[in-house]
């Protein structure tokens, strides 16, 4: 019983810390997002290391598909070190108006979708006018993904994006580049 109470206090404390950190963030997403144009497959060019992709060795993609409910099906795929494929399927929802660049995403079972902690922030913080190169993060800047419609990105476009991200407080030294062959 004491262990359960201590665990509950720890979880509530972590959520409060995360909420405070998010509230103090000055990170701004793009002004608006045309979700229909965002649909389709994106290749991961680079990312901050994270536990979600611990077993990924390369050829990482994210495919977004509009659902009749207005939500978005998310399918993340990557090649594993043994040559297999790892797939994670989730759901995203837009927060706010229909052009909001702020989304919430979950990979937990639908049965748990009523629990706020299973939904994570997914903010589009940079995207080019052609919807071919994007950066995604969340208020705490703990996660960062650079996504492209193609497996390779022109160096000039990538360098310009990296400069903008650095200007927003991201540490470019933490980036891990994703092999896409």
Each model region followed by its residue ranges:
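A beta-rich soluble binding module of mature secreted/lumenal proteins
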Residues: 1-181
